[in-house]
Amino acid sequence: MNFKYIVAVSFLIASAYARSVQNDEQSLSQRDVLEEESLREIRGIGGKILSGLKTALKGAAKELASTYLHRKRTAEEHEVMKRLEAVMRDLDSLDYPEEASERETRGFNQDEIANLFTKKEKRILGPVLSLVGNALGGLIKKIG
């Protein structure tokens, strides 16, 4: 009798443990899915913000280029224009990321590709903002 009781209790404990492990796995997988969805949403929002920022910077650079286009430029202004043109090419290259697609086909994971884009955007946006700030500062000084 005691042996049957011990076996029955052991079976109940084992089945309860198996159910709890299964429930834990399900809740973890549900959390993983929710985390992945929220990360996708955050990346989507970040992408939209960066896209808007790129568009604004392109517009500002084009406006600066058009103001410098129809008058004589100093050597410094000519250098600024060359830098703006280079920045515009770099911003356009963000829209067509050939490097990333090549890396993806070679087996890089998505995190490495996202880090590559983040580094590239930081490398481009820093000089763009300083160039636009310097050009606008120069225009304000000339106007004022």
UniProtKB/Swiss-Prot annotation:
Coiled coil: none annotated. The modification Isoleucine amide is found at residue 143. The keyword Secreted applies. Residues 19-43, 73-122 form a propeptide. One of its GO terms (biological process) is killing of cells of another organism. Residues 1-18 form the signal peptide. Expressed by the skin glands. GO terms for cellular component: extracellular region. Pfam families: Bombinin. It is found in: Secreted. Keywords: Amidation, Amphibian defense peptide, Antibiotic, Antimicrobial, Cleavage on pair of basic residues, Cytolysis, Fungicide, Hemolysis, Secreted, Signal. Maximin-3 shows antibacterial activity against both Gram-positive and Gram-negative bacteria. It also shows antimicrobial activity against the fungus C.albicans, but not against A.flavus nor P.uticale. It has little hemolytic activity. It possess a significant cytotoxicity against tumor cell lines. It possess a significant anti-HIV activity. It shows high spermicidal activity. Maximin-H16 shows antimicrobial activity against bacteria and against the fungus C.albicans. Shows strong hemolytic activity. Belongs to the bombinin family. This is Maximins 3/H16. It comes from Bombina maxima (Giant fire-bellied toad). The lineage of its organism: Eukaryota, Metazoa, Chordata, Craniata, Vertebrata.
